[in-house]
C-alpha cells in the first residue's frame, strides 16, 4: 500500500490499487468485475461517492474495501449508516456472508441498548439515520474512522437535525463513502447536502448560493433547474464511481432484495389481537384449513395496511414508512415500476397515496379482478407505449400469465403471495423477451 501511495504522490495518475493484487476477497461470493473496480476506487479515495444503480452490489464492494483497510490497519472501526429497512436484511446479512471473520453489531432499540453496542468492540457497527442523533455523543467517542452512508439521499437536506448529527461524526480525518443510485433524482438542490457532508469544500458555504448557481428563478416562488445543472451536480459530487446495471455485464438478469420495516403501533396492536385469537383457537377449538387461512389472511392484510373488520368496513393503518420505501424504489429508476398488491382495499389506498406522492393521478394505474378485458388491454398498451404511467399496481392473480410489461425494470411485492408458481409468473411480466434492462425484485417485509 505504501508503494502505491508513493506512486500517487509522484504524480502517477491511476496506479493499480494493491487491493486488486494482494487482497484475498473473502466470503461466499466471487466479486464481479465492476465490484473489484468499485472496491479499489473506495479504498483509494478517503472521501468519495459510489453512485452505481440499485442492484449493482455496492454493499459487498464497500464491505471488501473496508475489510482491506482494516487488514492494512489504515482504519480501526467502521460505522455503517443506512435506513432501518436494510440494517439487517442487507447489511448484517451481507457482512456475515462476505466478512465472516469480522464482528458486526446493530445499534438499535433504546438509547442504552444502542450505546452498549457502540461501547462494545465490534469492528462494524450498523445504525439507522435517526439513531445517529439519539446516541450522538457515544458515536463521537466511538473511534469510527470510516463512515459508510448507504441510501445517502436520506441526508440530502443540510438543515435537518439528522444531517447535522451525522456531519459532526464525519469530522476531518474520518473517511466518508456516500452511496446512492439517485444523487439528485428530484432536483439539483438535493446534491448540496451530500456534497457538504462528504467534501464541504466542493460547494458554496450557503445553500442559497448553491440554489442561485443551479436553479433559475421563474417567478417569485418558482424555480427551475439551470440548463447545465446536471453537469454542475456531477462536478461537485466527485470523486465518484458509477455503474448502471447494463454496464455490469456479469450481473444476473434478475436480482432480488428484501427491505424490512417496522409495523406501526396500531398495526402491532391489531396483529397481536389476531395472533392471540389464533392461539386461543389452537388451545380449544378444532382448527380447520379454512379458518386458519382466514386468520393468516388477516395478519397479511394488517401488515400491508388495511383490513376488513367483521362488520365489513375497512380499517386503514398508517403506511407512511412502507410507502416511503416504495417511493425510494420508484425514484431509483428512470424506467417504470410494477407493484404486486394482493388485496383490493390495499391497492385502492396505495393508488391514492402514490398519485399524491407523484403529483399526478395519471402516473398510477391499477389492474385487478373486475377490470374489464378491454380496459386492461388499454392500460397495458399505455404502460408499454406512453411515458405518463410510472407505476402499475397489479393483483397477482390478475397478472400471472401472458402479459408483457417490459417497460418496467423494478418489481415490488407489497405483500407476499402463497403460490410459488404465481410469484414466478408475475416476475416474468417484466423479466421476459423484449426486456433490455436487468430487473430488480424488491420484497417489502414487515411481519414481526
What are these regions (language model features)?
Residues 61, 74-95, 185-190, 343-344:
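Conserved Walker A/P-loop ATP-binding site and its immediately adjacent core
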Residues 174-208, 248-275, 394-448:
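SF2 helicase/translocase ATPase core recognition
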Residues 45-65:
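Walker A/P-loop
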Residues 126-131, 137-141, 161-174, 178-179, ...:
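Inter-lobe coupling linker of SF2 helicases/translocases
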Residues 86-110, 198-201, 357-358:
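Conserved helix-turn-beta segment of the N-terminal RecA-like "Helicase ATP-binding" lobe
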Residues 113-116, 338-340, 348-349, 355, ...:
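Conserved helicase ATPase core of P-loop NTP-dependent helicases/translocases
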Residues 15-51:
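Conserved pre-motif I regulatory segment
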Residues 120-135, 385-400:
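Conserved two-lobed SF2 helicase motor
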